Amino acid sequence: MGTLTASLVAPSKLNPEKHSSLFVYKTRRKSHKNQSIVPVARLFGPAIFEASKLKVLFLGVDEKKHPGKLPRTYTLTHSDITSKLTLAISQTINNSQLQGWYNRLQRDEVVAEWKKVKGKMSLHVHCHISGGHFMLDLFARLRYYIFCKELPVVLKAFVHGDENLLKNYPELQQALVWVYFHSNIQEFNKVECWGPLKDAASPSSSGVGGGMNTSFTSNSNIKWILPKPCEETCTCCFPPMSVIPWPSTTNVENGTIQQGLQEQQS
């Protein structure tokens, strides 16, 4: 993921190598003395995954196989300095990736966990849209759009980084992807179902997120039910509680889930 807020620095201090992958900057000269910075989101064209820019860390988990009784989570962060992605695969969220004032300011990390609910595996992905400081609130709509646009890249990073696991358990490619958008603004505080992982990780032809194939999006009446674990102790649900410490504040009306951005625009 790239930076989701514009850097407030003078044009002379902008280093092309430190530009976010999601924003480009243009300088517009109004006079010899005054210049303004115009952040232009790179909103057009497909999001592209580059394997050479992904660093994968396995922390306390098996690279190829995964015991059914151990959680498996993904923590993905982006560096504006190196333009590289770091993916930690572990039993819990890798908090060391999220430390520092810069990460707390940008909040462009994506975290996810595998869950088994009533015998079915699904991938639950969390994104922070707004809340915490005014800059995030100011750019909430843009952040939501960019997260949606870039999520196929994020999911592709998960698939590529954990490819040995998916080779050993190919059925995970059919697991549904649930995306939780966390925001203090009701419009963006919601859950979306992005369909099977193999489709959600593929950019749509329009370049917009929600990379579901035609067979998935053709029926606009499809309603997905967010899987809920059994209330009593069982063997068909794991883990019993989410290992991601974000509050469950997303809006779910009547137990149904909104579909991805591509579906909304079709």
UniProtKB/Swiss-Prot annotation:
User: What residue range does the UniProt record give for the transit peptide?
Assistant: 1-50
Taken from the record, one Pfam family name reads Staygreen
GO term, biological process aspect, one: chlorophyll catabolic process
List localization entries.
Plastid, Chloroplast
Superkingdom: Eukaryota
A cellular component term from Gene Ontology for this protein is: chloroplast
Q: Which UniProt keywords apply?
A: Chloroplast, Plastid, Transit peptide
Q: Cross-referenced PANTHER family, in alphabetical order?
A: LP06106P, PROTEIN STAY-GREEN 1, CHLOROPLASTIC-RELATED
| Family named by the database record | Belongs to the staygreen family.
Query: What job does the chain carry out?
Result: Required to trigger chlorophyll degradation during leaf senescence and fruit ripening.
Name under which the protein is recorded: Protein STAY-GREEN homolog, chloroplastic
To which species is this protein native? Capsicum annuum
**Encoding gene (name):** SGR
